């Protein structure tokens, strides 16, 4: 995919994601990373490190994705600040990622 062409259409893609999937771009990135890591359980801090976004809060996105039933979240028994994501539904995640790529491909093919 041509990066410059993608960037030129980034706002259109963001609007389409919100309209069709009710998700933000960051939520798609989080799902892509969860799918890539393929772990049954992951600490939210570890996920942030893998995303390379230590200074960006992702709690709103985590809550939204959890509300959609893509995974469950729970607090650590000994340290309430730690949040674990578990029971990750990889089949739903893969389906959403596939829809994302379809949306992007459709937008980029219409613009060319």
What are the language-model segments listed below?
Residues 1-21, 68-70, 85-87:
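N-terminal leader segment of winged-helix/HTH proteins
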Residues 2-4, 12-13, 46-49, 62, ...:
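Short, structured secondary-structure boundary patches
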Residues 14, 92-112:
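Amphipathic alpha-helical dimerization/coiled-coil segments
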Residues 15-54:
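N-terminal helix-turn-helix DNA-binding core of bacterial DNA-binding proteins
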Residues 21-26, 43, 76-99:
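Short, cationic-aromatic polyanion-contact patches
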């Amino acid at each position: 995919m041509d990066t410059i062409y993608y960037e030129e259409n980034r706002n259109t893609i963001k609007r389409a994601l919100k309209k069709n999937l009710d998700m933000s771009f960051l939520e798609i990135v989080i799902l892509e990373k969860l799918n890539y890591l393929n772990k049954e359980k992951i600490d939210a801090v570890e996920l942030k490190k893998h995303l390379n976004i230590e200074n960006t809060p992702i709690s709103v996105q985590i809550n939204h994705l959890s509300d959609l039933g893509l995974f469950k979240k729970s607090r650590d028994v000994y340290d309430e600040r730690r949040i674990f994501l578990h029971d990750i539904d990889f089949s739903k995640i893969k389906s959403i990622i596939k829809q994302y790529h379809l949306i992007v491909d459709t937008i980029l093919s219409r613009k060319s």
